[in-house]
Structure formats: C-alpha cells, structure tokens
UniProtKB/Swiss-Prot annotation:
Residues 160-333 form the OBG-type G domain. This is GTPase Obg. Residues 1-159 form the Obg domain. Mg(2+) binds at residues 173, 193.
Length: 390
C-alpha cells in the first residue's frame, strides 16, 4: 500500500435540533400549559488512533466527514434525538492541526486514543423552559446552534526509538535490513529510499527497539532540493539519531563536508531536532584496511570537532553492527520516555458553543418578568418568538 503521511480533510459536526413551541391540548384539561420539548444535540466528530493502520491514503480520496443533525423537539415534552457521532480512524503517530488557526489539536500517540475535533451544536430549548409565575403561556423557544466546522491537516509521524540520518547511499537501508526484518529497497544509486520505513531490532526475547529509516538528505534540502526535508518530521519522536557517514564515498565527495551538510539541514528544519542526542557512525569500513579506516574516521571526527564516542561499522558485512545495537539498547533503557512528555497535549481547544445555554438562560433570567410580552408582535409567524444569538 502506498505510504501517505499528509492529508487534508473537512470535518463538520451536526447542528443542534430546534426547540418546540407547543401547548397541552387535552379533553377536560383547560389551559394545559406549555409542553414543547427541547431539540437534540448535534453529533460530534472524533479522531481515534488505530495501530492497525500505517498510512493516510484513505483520506486522499474521502475528504469530508459530517456528523448527524440533532432532531427537533416535539410536543408532550418530547426531546429530539441526539445526532450520531462520526469517528475517523487514523494511524498511531498522527498529529491533528487546525488549518484555520494553525493550532495543534492533539497528537495521537496511543492505540485507542480519542480526540474531539468538531463539537456538535447545542440543542434548542422548548417553550416549557420559559414558563414562569407571570408567563403561563410562553411562546419563546431557541433554535439549535450550528456544529463546528474545521479544515484539518493530518500529519503522520512515525513512532520510533532510533532515527537514521545521512546522505543518499550512506548505507541506511542496508543497515536496517541487517539489524531487522525490514526489507527496504537497496541499490547502487542515490534516493533508492523514497518513503520512510520502520524496523524492529530484537536484541533478545525481552529487549528490542524500533529504528526509522528516511530518505537521504542533500545540500539545499531545506529549499526543496532532492526529496526536501519533509521526512525529517518522522524523527521528531526519536530518542537518539544515528548519523551514518560513508567513510569512503565512491563518488569522491568529502565525508567531512557531507556530514556538515546533514547537520546544517537538520538545524534549518528544527533546533529541537538538532539538539537531540546524535551518534556518529562511520559505515562501509570493509572497503578499507582496519588501520586506514580507524585513521580516516579519527581525522573526520577531529575535522567536525566531534569529541564524543564514534562507531565504525560495515552494514553489508555486519562488522561492528551488533556492538552498536547493544549500545543503542543500553541508551534506550537508561533514558526512558518521560511519561509527562509522552502524554503532553496542547492547551484546551475552544469550541464555538461551549457556554451558549448558560449565557442564554442568564440573559432570560435577567429580563423583567412583567415585560415578557413587550416585544410581542401579532404578525409573528405562528405567534412564535425566536431567541437566537450567534
């Protein structure tokens, strides 16, 4: 199935049902009084994370989702039926952004997590609500309010412990094939990897971690060169980045300059991502003698001002790969995800009609009961007064 990590959709919650103006008419019961019921609330639109999904391709074709409208109230104090909700299932790791305001509504990071993205309209009030000691036959009602309408941007970001960085043909796909069951395409030309891929590295029966491979970066990626930097978002949730450097590029390019390009493009994309722990890994050492590879790696590290530990591996032959994976596993165990950060959610999203009923009833209560019919007009349609403010 084609990997799609972005989609725009329209969500529309259901409108609230209108209140009813009705009076009890029954034999032997004179002046039965008002019995108009309230309308039903409009249906909501929800997002739900599903671990069985891994792409947003479905929302490239189906772009509009509408919840059901609440039914109108009826006589005999019958309340209208609430509109049915709509649930949109998305892959775990999806970020939901309101395109109108630019705010992040939420990150779907756990299976089964639900997020309210459009709230249904409030129900209208029937005339029974407006009965008082001085107004025995109220002809007021309120209409239901419109449901929320939002244009949303869905961004799928892979959930991985380890992210891989490097120039095209640095050996990232070969590495992930060597350490996991993932089988990304491997070839001797640049940009073999066109979409991100995940691999699970199992160290033993109880220990494992997830590694993400993204397409390679080239100079000018921030300006759109190559495949650009849009895939870097898939590394935002990684705990450590493995920066793979081809120690002896076949095209004759300078490994030091290649490494600096990656660092530069990383900083252009996000300072937070650039600040993540990053390990230097020299790949393809099987192409050189051991002493020559060590000497060249040391020279590159010094040119980059790198003072931390670095690794020499050959993803093709497996040399040094196991030691690197165990060190990564140890780092992940010693640096667990902070629960507070993992569950971090944006500020409360405001919906249009949150305080509608409270405000309406407060305004009505403040009116002088003796003047309830001052604005009465015999020409009103069906003798009904509508109370509705938007």
């Amino acid at each position: 199935m084609k990997f799609v990590d972005e989609a725009s959709i329209l969500v529309v919650a259901g409108d609230g049902g209108n209140g009813c103006v009705s009076f009890r008419r029954e034999k032997y019961i004179p002046k039965g009084g008002p019995d108009g019921g309230d309308g039903g609330d409009g249906g909501d639109v929800w997002m739900e994370a599903d671990e069985n999904l891994n792409t947003l391709i479905d929302y490239r074709f189906e772009k509009s989702f509408r919840a059901e409208r609440g039914q109108n109230g009826a006589s005999r104090d019958c309340t209208g039926k609430r509109g049915k909700d709509v649930t949109i299932k998305v892959p775990v790791g999806t970020r939901v952004i309101d395109q109108g305001t630019g705010e992040t509504m939420g990150d779907m990071t756990k299976h089964g997590q639900r997020l309210l993205v459009a709230k249904g309209g409030w129900h209208g009030l029937g005339n029974t609500r407006f009965k008082s000691s001085v107004n025995r036959t109220p002809r007021q009602k309120t209409n239901g309010t419109p449901g929320d309408k939002r244009e949303l941007l869905l961004e799928l970001m892979l959930l991985a412990d380890v992210g891989m960085l490097g120039m095209p043909n640095a050996g990232k796909s070969t590495f992930i094939r060597a350490v996991s069951a993932a089988k990304p395409k491997v070839a001797d030309y640049p940009f073999t990897t066109l979409v991100p891929s995940l691999g699970v590295v199992r160290m033993d029966n109880e220990k494992s971690f997830v590694v993400a491979d993204i397409p390679g970066l080239i100079e000018g990626a921030a300006e759109g060169a190559g495949l650009g930097i849009r895939f870097l978002k898939h590394l935002e949730r990684c705990r450590v980045l493995l920066h793979l450097i081809d120690i002896d590029p076949i095209d004759g390019t300078d490994p030091v300059e290649n490494a600096r390009i990656i660092i530069s493009e990383l900083e252009k994309y996000s300072q937070d991502l650039a600040a993540k722990p990053r390990w230097l890994v020299f790949n393809k050492i099987d192409l050189l003698d051991k002493a020559e590879a060590e000497e060249k790696a040391k020279a590159i590290a010094e040119a980059l001002g790198w003072e931390d530990k670095y690794y020499l591996i050959s993803a093709a032959s497996g040399l040094g790969v196991k030691d690197l994976c165990w060190d990564v596993m140890t780092f992940i165990i010693e640096n667990p995800v902070v629960q507070a950060e993992e569950a971090k959610q944006p500020e409360k999203v405001e919906f249009m009609w949150d305080d509608y009923h409270r405000q309406q009833l407060e305004e009505i209560a403040e009116e002088d009961d003796e003047d309830w019919d001052d604005d009465w007009d015999e020409d009103d349609e069906e003798g009904v007064e509508f109370i509705y403010k938007r």
